[in-house]
C-alpha cells in the first residue's frame, strides 16, 4: 500500500457548501485516478463558535488555542465528533465514497494527555497505534477523524486539529496537507511564500507578519515536517481544480521544510 495522505480540513470549510462540494469532487476525481489511501482530519472551530453563540457561552483563547472548561467539553465534543464529523460523512455519502467517522481515541490511533491545566480539557496529541486505520484503508474506506481525543484516565480532550493531524501522520507514516482558507503563508505584501523554513518562520513571527492562528498553523506544520522528516503543505481549498495535483505531491500553497 502506498503511504497514505492526510488532508487536514480547516474549520471554515465546514461552513461552506461550495467549498465542500469542490473538495469532495476533487477527492472523487483523485480516488478514481490514484491508488493512494486518503484520510481526513478535521477540527471545526466555526461549528463550535456558532454553538457557543447560540448557548451564550464565552469563547476564550490563550496563545491561539481554545480554552475548554470542564462544563464545555461535552458541548465541544458534540459539535466536533458529532455535527462536524457527520456533516463530512454525509458529503462523502453523497459523492459515493465509503467513509468511517472516528475520533482520535478509536483504536488508540492517537494518544492524548492534558496539555496545560490552565487550558482545561485541551489535549496534547502523540502518535498511537496504526492498526485500526490501516485496516480501514486496506478495506477501501475513507477515515474521517475529528480532533477530539481521550486520556488514559478517560477524560475527553479537545485537541488542536493541526496537531492532531501531525500525530496521526506520524502514527501512519503519512504525508500531510493542511487545507485552510488561505492559499498558503503570505509575506508582508500579501504574496504567497512558496517555501518556508523554521528560520524564515521565526523572522516573520518576530516582524509581526505571521500572527495569531497562523502562528499555531505554521508551528504545527514545522513540528509536523520535523516529526515526519518530510515537507508539509499548507494550501487553500478554494482552488479545487488544483487539489488533485496537490494530493499527488505538487505544491500549490506553501511547502514547509523540515
Curated annotation (Swiss-Prot):
Its EC number is 2.7.2.8. Substrate binds at residues 44-45, 66, 158. One of its GO terms (cellular component) is cytoplasm. One of its GO terms (biological process) is arginine biosynthetic process via ornithine. Pathway: Amino-acid biosynthesis; L-arginine biosynthesis; N(2)-acetyl-L-ornithine from L-glutamate: step 2/4. It is found in: Cytoplasm. InterPro entries: AceGlu_kinase-like_sf, AcgluKinase_fam, ArgB, Asp/Glu/Uridylate_kinase, NAGK-NC. It comes from the Bacteria. The record marks 8, 217 as: Transition state stabilizer. It catalyses: N-acetyl-L-glutamate + ATP = N-acetyl-L-glutamyl 5-phosphate + ADP. It is an enzyme of class 2 (transferase). Belongs to the acetylglutamate kinase family. ArgB subfamily. PANTHER family: N-ACETYLGLUTAMATE SYNTHASE, N-ACETYLGLUTAMATE SYNTHASE, MITOCHONDRIAL. Catalyzes the ATP-dependent phosphorylation of N-acetyl-L-glutamate. This is Acetylglutamate kinase. The gene is argB.
Amino acid at each position: 500500500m502506498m503511504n497514505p495522505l492526510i488532508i487536514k480540513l480547516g474549520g471554515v470549510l465546514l461552513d461552506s457548501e461550495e467549498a465542500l462540494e469542490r473538495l469532495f469532487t476533487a477527492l472523487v476525481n483523485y480516488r478514481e485516478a490514484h491508488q493512494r489511501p486518503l484520510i481526513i482530519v478535521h477540527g471545526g472551530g466555526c461549528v463550535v463558535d456558532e454553538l457557543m453563540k447560540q448557548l451564550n457561552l464565552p469563547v476564550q483563547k490563550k496563545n491561539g488555542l481554545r480554552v475548554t472548561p470542564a462544563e464545555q467539553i461535552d458541548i465541544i465534543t458534540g459539535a466536533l465528533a458529532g455535527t462536524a464529523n457527520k456533516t463530512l460523512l454525509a458529503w462523502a455519502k453523497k459523492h459515493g465514497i465509503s467513509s468511517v467517522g472516528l475520533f482520535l481515541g478509536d483504536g488508540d490511533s492517537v494518544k492524548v494527555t492534558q496539555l496545560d491545566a490552565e487550558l482545561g480539557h485541551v489535549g496534547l496529541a502523540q502518535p498511537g497505534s496504526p492498526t485500526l486505520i490501516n485496516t480501514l484503508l486496506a478495506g477501501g474506506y475513507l477515515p474521517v477523524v475529528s480532533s477530539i481525543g481521550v486520556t488514559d484516565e478517560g477524560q475527553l480532550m479537545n485537541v488542536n486539529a493541526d496537531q492532531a493531524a501531525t500525530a496521526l501522520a506520524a502514527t501512519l507514516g503519512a504525508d500531510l496537507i493542511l487545507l485552510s482558507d488561505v492559499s498558503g503563508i503570505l509575506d508582508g505584501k500579501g504574496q504567497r511564500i512558496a517555501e518556508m523554513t523554521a528560520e524564515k518562520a521565526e523572522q516573520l513571527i518576530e516582524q509581526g507578519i505571521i500572527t495569531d492562528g497562523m502562528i499555531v498553523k505554521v508551528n504545527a506544520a514545522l513540528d509536523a515536517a520535523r516529526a515526519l522528516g518530510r515537507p508539509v503543505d499548507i494550501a487553500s481549498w478554494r482552488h479545487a481544480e488544483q487539489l488533485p495535483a496537490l494530493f499527488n505531491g505538487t505544491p500549490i500553497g506553501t511547502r514547509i521544510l523540515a
